[in-house]
Amino acid sequence: MKVLLIEDSKFQRLANERALVKAGYSVIHAADGEQGLRSACEQLPDLVLLDMMLPKVSGLDVLRALKGDPLVKHIPVIVLSGLGQANEAKLLKEGAAAFFVKSEKSLENNSSILIQAVEAVLSNAKARV
């Protein structure tokens, strides 16, 4: 399974990649929204992990673009946010499959919860096909 990780924080990107690879996933990186959109269309991942605070194109605009593109709109997107759950309902309405609050305080716990979220979303996506 291929996961596109769109995250501008090198620290978060490396931590999430390590957890995903350990869980058996192949990871594609994108450090900004523009690169993330391009990678999604070129690589057609099974899942997108999308940070909300990105340079060039915001996470919300990336989510809207992904869900508006017939080529990739079927790909589930898990939104990653360090700002808490204030916009969770709005992002789920925009098409996010799940919302994940990231924390730098408990990285190990973060990683295991993220993997659980990834597995749940991918399992739901398979069930719908």
Task: Show where each model-derived region lies.
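Conserved acidic carboxylate
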Residues: 7
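Acidic catalytic/metal-coordinating carboxylates
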Residues: 32-35, 58-64
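The feature encodes the CheY-like receiver
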Residues: 55, 73
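Two-component/phosphorelay signaling modules centered on CheY-like receiver
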Residues: 10-28
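Acidic, metal-coordinating helix/loop segments flanking the phosphotransfer/catalytic sites
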Residues: 29-47
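Active-site residues of response regulator receiver
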Residues: 51, 81
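Alpha4 helix (beta4-alpha4-beta5 surface) of REC/receiver domains from two-component response regulators
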Residues: 61, 83-119
